[in-house]
Amino acid sequence: MMFSKPVVLATTALATFAAATPLVARTEPTCSSTEIKCCENVGTAAVVSSVLTPILVSIPLVGPLLSLLGLNAVVALLFGTVDVVLGLTCSGIDVGGSCNAQTVCCENVQFNGLINVGCVAIDIL
């Protein structure tokens, strides 16, 4: 019983803080120039499957899972959803450089840069 008051106080404080924190909709991706990628293939797993499948097969332990479970199950397992937008065959863009494919900003990079996850198409001037 001695710990009940601190626990109630901490829980109340956290709930108050969470309720007071405003939610802000993201309309533009926040991406620094070092995170901008030029990707030849951008889309969901279904859209980029012909490029994604050989990449996944080449990754140890993922290849056998792909054979057992199929592409959608492996993508959901690795990235949380089959609807995540992936960037494949990507390279960085130097300041002042150009991109002859799709310019994207991606939330994170997986498998040493082979797969860029959570990508949003952007326009650069």
Swiss-Prot record:
Subcellular location per the Swiss-Prot or TrEMBL entry: Secreted; Secreted, Cell wall
A GO cellular component entry from the record: fungal-type cell wall
Entry-linked Pfam families: Hydrophobin (PF01185)
Keywords from the named record: Cell wall, Disulfide bond, Secreted, Signal
Domain of life where this protein originates: Eukaryota
Molecular function (Gene Ontology), one example: structural constituent of cell wall
Record keyword Secreted present: yes
Main localization category: secreted
Protein purpose: Aerial growth, conidiation, and dispersal of filamentous fungi in the environment rely upon a capability of their secreting small amphipathic proteins called hydrophobins (HPBs) with low sequence identity. Class I can self-assemble into an outermost layer of rodlet bundles on aerial cell surfaces, conferring cellular hydrophobicity that supports fungal growth, development and dispersal; whereas Class II form highly ordered films at water-air interfaces through intermolecular interactions but contribute nothing to the rodlet structure.
Protein name per Swiss-Prot or TrEMBL: Unclassified hydrophobin 8
Protein species of origin: Pleurotus ostreatus (strain PC15) (Oyster mushroom)
